[in-house]
């Protein structure tokens, strides 16, 4: 005890094996903490990080409970996750140290950093963010497969920045459902039909306006009786803003919005559907930008009802009665959760096929995609990045930021795990712009000679990117989530003595409603009376860990 742990200190690897599923994450974290504390009595965040890889949990294997011979052990281990876990650890100590390889000489370092930095800056807005196309492949395929023979009637949920606006723009560009789907899958019907009409759209983007105008023009051209205003989405936003706090018949309101958007002389969905049937045409109504108008959903029963009626009552009615009318509602996940107060989980599951939620694997693929677009010829495989295996992606990630944040046989953190934990929230949400922004800041040169030539981004550059990412993240949250802004300002203004993790619930730092909103958004998690913040916001808020808190936060972040 009391050993001074450094990156090259020879530490044992402790295997936790045969841990039953009944063990909670909390119990496992306490066990790890007890073991690591044997090696250092006084820890800092930096030295705690060096102990992250010392305790390794091996998956439970019932066939290894009763063993009679060495031969049986070898036979039982063959092909097991336990075997591969041990193999990976042993390999890093006995293979040649790849960090000595020269893939990127010193004279290339600054050039590569600038290319990545410039490309990342160019990828920051949703409308021109080609990165979203890579990551939305699966939900788009799901949508097209589910509605290959009919117009779609669905809710596309996703957090802010998950790609909703990007997908909305893609639909506008193609102008009708059949053409959109035929470009995803050539086997689908490519005959024009399912014409899009933007009933509501985001008001915060100049780039989307030409797409909206062109889509409305095509809608009016294709549907004989259509007379949609070129500003229909602005007119509808105004109507909604007038009624948003009034206790009205929301079924009637939405029906009138929909039919009057097509033609002001129409009075009902049934009249619209009949006219479409006669003309042998189908339409798809598009709704986006609700969060810009309905800004008080967590506290306003009226606004909750407006969304609930739209996403349940209206959507179900159209689905059951009107085969020529489609509806795609783009909705921020937190708004859906606050508005659908009964059976939200069932609602979420119903539309899970179209949810825009990216996994950590997809986020890592995005990093490879970004570098490949910035540095031509970086990715050399025949299989596309979106279809590449984890093993292939892992090989290229090592070329970007190394296996570890140091030598491959050091005690430093595994780079990919460290980055995922640094950028994720407690809901497992990792947005495209988080990875893009990380690469933007990590590619800012520190002006020093690179210590390694086997990777593009140096450990110091990776670490230095996090505080900048954290500050940007909090600025975005305060700008985009009106209900979270005062909570973040309260946390920012706490005295330094109170800025420690875990926070104690009984200290009353947050009200019950504030706690609920933060947990819902993924920026707080409660474990008994203890409350934790994720890394992505902790840094900019200036919170520090108390002893043993950091491993608990990491286990919660990486369990997704």
Positions of PLM-derived features:
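C-terminal leucine-rich, beta-strand-based interaction scaffolds used for sensing/assembly
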Residues: 2, 14-23, 50, 403-560
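Long, basic/Gly/Ser/Thr-rich N-terminal segments
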Residues: 2-103
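The catalytic "switch" region of P-loop NTPases
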Residues: 18-24, 34, 38, 88-101, ...
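Charge-rich, solvent-exposed alpha-helical interaction surfaces
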Residues: 30, 34, 38, 50, ...
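Walker A/P-loop-proximal flanking segment of P-loop NTPase domains
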Residues: 58, 67-69, 76-186, 553-560
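Short linear interaction motifs
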Residues: 131-154, 265-268, 307-312, 348, ...
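Alpha-helix termini
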Residues: 142-147, 176-185, 273-276, 315-322, ...
């Amino acid at each position: 005890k009391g050993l001074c742990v450094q990156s090259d200190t020879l530490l044992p690897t402790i295997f936790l094996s045969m841990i039953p599923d009944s063990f909670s994450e909390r119990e496992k974290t306490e066990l790890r903490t007890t073991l690591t504390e044997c090696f250092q009595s006084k820890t800092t965040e930096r030295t705690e990080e060096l102990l992250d890889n010392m305790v390794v949990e091996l998956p439970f294997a019932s066939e290894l409970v009763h063993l009679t011979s060495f031969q049986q052990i070898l036979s039982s281990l063959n092909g097991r996750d336990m075997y591969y876990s041990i193999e990976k650890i042993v390999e890093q100590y006995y293979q040649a140290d790849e960090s000595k390889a020269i893939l990127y000489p010193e004279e290339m370092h600054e050039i590569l950093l600038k290319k990545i930095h410039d490309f990342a800056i160019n990828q920051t807005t949703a409308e021109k963010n080609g990165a979203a196309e890579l990551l939305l492949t699966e939900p788009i395929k799901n949508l097209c497969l589910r509605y290959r023979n009919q117009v779609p009637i669905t809710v596309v949920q996703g957090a802010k920045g998950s790609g909703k606006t990007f997908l909305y723009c893609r639909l506008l560009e193609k102008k009708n459902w059949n053409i959109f789907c035929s470009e995803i899958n050539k086997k689908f019907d490519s005959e024009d039909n399912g014409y899009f009409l933007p009933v509501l759209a985001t008001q915060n983007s100049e780039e989307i306006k030409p797409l909206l105008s062109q889509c409305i023009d095509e809608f009016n051209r294709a549907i004989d009786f259509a007379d949609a205003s070129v500003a229909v989405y602005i007119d509808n936003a105004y109507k909604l803003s007038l009624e948003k706090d009034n206790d009205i018949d929301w079924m009637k309101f939405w029906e009138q919005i929909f039919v009057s958007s097509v033609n002001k002389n129409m009075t009902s969905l049934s009249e619209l559907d009949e006219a479409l049937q006669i003309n042998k045409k189908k339409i798809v109504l598009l709704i986006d930008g609700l969060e810009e108008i309905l800004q008080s959903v967590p506290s306003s029963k009226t606004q909750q009802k407006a969304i609930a009626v739209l996403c349940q009552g209206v959507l179900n009615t159209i689905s059951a009665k009107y085969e020529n009318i489609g509806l795609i509602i783009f909705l921020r996940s937190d708004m859906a959760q606050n508005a659908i107060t009964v059976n939200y989980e069932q609602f979420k599951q119903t539309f899970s096929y179209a949810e825009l939620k990216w996994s950590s694997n997809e986020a890592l693929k995005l990093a490879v995609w970004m570098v490949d677009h910035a540095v031509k010829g970086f990715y050399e495989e025949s299989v596309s990045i979106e279809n590449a295996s984890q093993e292939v992606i892992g090989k290229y990630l090592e070329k970007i930021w190394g296996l570890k944040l140091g030598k491959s046989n050091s005690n430093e953190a595994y780079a990919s795990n460290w980055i995922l934990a640094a950028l994720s929230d407690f809901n497992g949400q990792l947005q495209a712009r988080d990875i893009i922004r990380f690469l933007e800041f990590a590619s800012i040169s520190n002006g020093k000679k690179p210590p390694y030539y086997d990777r593009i981004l140096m450990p110091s550059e990776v670490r230095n990117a996090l505080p900048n990412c954290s500050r940007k993240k909090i600025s975005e949250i305060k700008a985009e989530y009106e209900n979270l802004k005062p909570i973040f300002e309260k946390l920012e203004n706490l005295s330094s003595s109170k800025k420690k993790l875990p926070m104690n619930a009984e200290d009353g730092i947050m009200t019950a409603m504030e706690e609920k909103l933060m947990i819902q958004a993924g920026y707080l998690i409660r474990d008994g009376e203890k409350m934790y913040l994720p890394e992505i916001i902790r840094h900019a808020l200036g919170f520090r860990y108390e002893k043993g808190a950091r491993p608990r936060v990491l286990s919660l972040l990486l369990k997704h």
